[in-house]
A protein has these predicted regions:
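Active-site glycine-centered loops adjacent to acidic/histidine catalytic or metal-binding residues
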Residues: 65, 93-94, 123-124, 195, ...
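Core catalytic region of metal-dependent phosphoesterases/phosphodiesterases
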Residues: 73-148
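N-terminal active-site segment of His-dependent metallophosphoesterases
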Residues: 22-106, 187
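His/acidic metal-ligating clusters that form di-metal
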Residues: 25, 81-88, 163-243
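Beta-strand-turn-beta hairpins that frame and shape the catalytic cleft
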Residues: 50-61, 145-155, 182-190, 237-243, ...
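Stable alpha-helical elements in mature extracytoplasmic
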Residues: 56, 69-76, 92, 103, ...
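Binuclear metal-dependent phosphoesterase catalytic core
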Residues: 25-41, 46-47, 63, 146, ...
């Protein structure tokens, strides 16, 4: 056997082995490489602001804590689509259970079946492992805001327990900037979305009263929305008139619908 023939045999063997190995190898669950659509919140915020510009009334849905419950989430998306009266959808966080990259991508692909724009807040489970990095890639900043019609929606990261003081959670500077933005744009009402409400386990309750004080600075605060404890609740947590509406986990097969009009708002818990 010549050296050239032997070299060709070895080369063929290596090609076969490498091909077989590629078929057997899978990426690490916490690999942060993302395939498919990214930067979803920013793109959908543009759509929301454009579609609702100048409107005094609109309707939106809230879902939350979809982690693991893919079939129930598909059914919720279908229910919202069938209504034909929803202008946009808010997700209250915890798309993932373990912060695994594929969890975000699976849930993103389900949410993309909506025929209206949606945005997602970050939940405490979304922060596990490399989840917060994947969230930033797929959705964007963990604090963000937008204007729907004449109303400002301020979406906050309140999962302080997962950050160990490495970032300000909640971010009072961001809240102050949003207050300034409302004044600049002459907006007279607003609402807040967060995953964990004050007095829950992952909120920084050392600053809970300070947080509530900040909320009172915002003109025309209508209500706050959150998820996290997997229950359907409406609470005046601080007995000061600010209502916190909690959307249960999607396995309860319930989502919330808010109708905004010039007189105020209506609220409904929809079972599907």
């Amino acid at each position: 056997m010549t050296i050239k023939t032997l070299a060709n045999i070895l080369l063929a063997f290596l090609v076969i082995c490498s091909t077989a190995a590629c078929d057997m190898l899978e990426s690490h669950p916490y690999d942060t490489r993302v395939t498919g659509e990214t930067g979803i919140n920013a793109k959908n915020i543009q759509r929301i602001e454009s579609l609702l510009k100048g409107r005094k009334s609109f309707r939106f849905a809230v879902i939350s804590d979809t982690q693991r419950w893919y079939d129930a989430t598909v059914d919720a998306v279908n229910s919202i689509r069938d209504r034909q009266d929803i202008d946009f959808v808010l997700h209250g966080g915890d798309q993932s259970d373990f912060g695994v990259t594929k969890e975000f991508l699976w849930m993103r692909d389900i949410m993309n079946r909506l025929d209206v724009p949606y945005v997602c807040a970050i939940g405490n489970h979304d922060c596990l492992g490399t989840g917060r990095d994947v969230f930033r890639t797929v959705y964007g900043d963990t604090n963000f805001a937008f204007t729907a019609g004449d109303m400002r929606f301020i979406c906050l990261n309140t999962n302080a327990l997962e950050y160990d003081y490495s970032e300000p959670v909640p971010d009072f500077d961001f809240m102050t900037a949003q207050l300034d933005k409302m004044q600049q744009d002459s907006l007279t009402r607003c609402a807040f979305l967060m995953h964990a409400a004050p007095q829950t386990d992952v909120f920084n309750n050392n600053v809970a009263k300070v947080f509530q004080h900040y909320l009172h600075m915002f003109p025309g605060l209508q209500f706050c929305m959150h998820g996290h404890t997997h229950a359907l609740t409406v609470k005046d947590i601080f007995d000061d008139g600010i209502l916190y509406y909690q959307c249960p986990n999607i396995d309860k097969r319930i989502y919330l619908v808010f109708t905004i009009n010039e007189e105020g708002y209506d609220y409904e818990a929809v079972e599907y």
